[in-house]
């Protein structure tokens, strides 16, 4: 994989980075066998030699296996792949067989013989006296140079170096974006037109979009609420949205976000991809094909958030090609006040836009975000925690009052949704506008021992409401298992895109969802298989080799995790394909 990175078109800086990074990490990889062999020398010279030969061969074998996995799937050895390789039958399910096992064993033995040969050659041939001072100095310079090069490339969005870093096994990046901004430097946001080197490890989309000659261009409005879980959508808590869904839209009762946090939830909604792709798309400043198609058609943009577009970095991913002047953030005051102002701004945008052009609207609401603020007129649960102080609260005792705050905040959110929907009705926009109303992720209140989100894949953290309305959509209730990953294929199909969804997404249009499907959700460092019977959380970072978590679909424990993993092998191999299809070399 390093060879491939060196052969890609790039720059002197990417070559420098890769060389110094490989030197530094080679030392890191040699440390375990070096330390173990030194300890073994306490029992004699030959035990030390044996550990040195075996340890070096095993480490080299691990790196070669990691390189092969990276070439095939676009990511390094992690807990997910490790489990498939070590579970009985797992290697076969990935396409391996007896011949492959035999070849692997022969290759491992050959490495041991090779390392033993190097050892005996070095023992028979005088070795020059090592200048340890110079070696340590050179090693430190390599490590500092590699980290400085990566940090600078990350801040300047210099893709050749960022792409090269993915070739280094188990690479741990260092960034200094916050420190640079504190000194007055501004990070690079916009991306230039991608060339072959910039595309790096992405193969997205797999086929260029084909659009029907008579493709419609309806208005699109995407309304997403922070931390909104599915059971808030009731006639009591959210009467406006409930009534709107009853009269005009489809209410999806079994809908999962693609993440347990904002970053992966929004990413999955716009891209139709699981969150393990986030980092590569961020490095490449690659927007989703949905936004590229909308911009190609000249849609007018009304984009508002009560948080920030820069964190998570949606200005460098979802909206990477949108001029910064069109990204409107409001960070003043509590979330409910920001939501009110942004609804006002969205209504003003609808009044002032060029009516001859279709529009794309996006509004991100903050009302349900912890600490769940709301005005007095939004109180429907009066028994709420009045003084919400993280330092003094007793979580076990106060969780009921905290949940009631959340309910009141969700009710305020509904009031703002009602204002916007009524405003669109007054402007005669509901009949020709596709509306998507959902949450970025859910929120847990100790139902399974956690509070908040971003920690587990419990239903309370990933189960969100979804209402879809627009031209040709009749009121209905859908109980099939749907996902945020299905929204991009749904919208693109309604825009007249003729490609199969697998050309650009992992999800499927909402009206084509099978009953027995699995869904995917992601966190910063894991992807979860969410099946009809079981859940499996799989670490995607290289360091999490043994951190698999298996439960039933209702989040209760299973008795035999290994048996469940063996039963799910074929499905998990499919997941592996989903996680690698849009990397170079993916299938």
What residues fall within each predicted segment?
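Transmembrane and membrane-interface helices of multi-pass
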Residues: 1-171
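Short beta-strand segments
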Residues: 224, 256, 303-305, 360-367, ...
